[in-house]
Amino acid sequence: MTGFTRKLQARYTLYLGSPIQRFLISGVLLTALWVDSIVFGVLLVLFVSGLQASLANEAVALRIPPVALLVLVSATGLLNDGRFSALVILGAIISTPILAGIGRTEEQKLSSEIVKILSAWLPLALVALSLGLLSARDVSSAALFLCLIFFHDIGLYVSVRSRSQKRYVPLLAMIGSLALLWTSIQMAATSLPPDGFVPIAIGLALSISAGRVAIALWTSDPPASICLASSYFLSAPIWTLFVLFLVP
């Protein structure tokens, strides 16, 4: 195993959080989801913005730009308008270099500051926006997605702690989620069609893994808040697209 592979493997499982922490997060979000989609959306916006602000290492003044962009983009999910949300995301991305240049010292590279700000708000914003749109369209699919990610991350946590067959950790962690997905579809516990299991399972597995790898490679020192949400980073938008196209 090369040094790069070891480094990537270590970052892939970086900051998983404790099982109790995962259980509390998933439990609160699921409870809010069943109460009302608006309540869930508001709680999600508050949660991701608080997570980013509390776990960031920068001074308070430096946290304001990414938190502001995060709240702005995440809140558009409450409007249930995908096109408007896409325009807001585009505007936020365009404004990021401007924010990165404000207050930058000569020793700080502009490209590094842009990456730092983007990594601080974009992953969490995509997660909150996707889940907000999803909860407004199909509550059962949103609840199932939260459960799938919970089972995956718990499986990842257990597999890492076992210290056996480390190269198979991503596969072992995925088994529980795919088993839950298959059972839910077969028992009609979700609106997803039975014949959609294979493409959904492939999309879910690839997007979870790709999201964690992307966060691991994005920056040399990703914030803990981003690592905590890395399983959601690409899987939430992909899952939302599956639901929008497969659920009548």
Predicted regions and their residues:
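Membrane-embedded alpha-helical bundles of polytopic integral membrane proteins
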Residues: 2-211, 215-223
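Membrane-embedded alpha-helical segments of transport systems
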Residues: 65-67, 175-176, 230-241
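Interfacial loop-to-transmembrane junctions
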Residues: 215-239
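Juxtamembrane boundary at the C-terminal end of a transmembrane helix
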Residues: 240-248
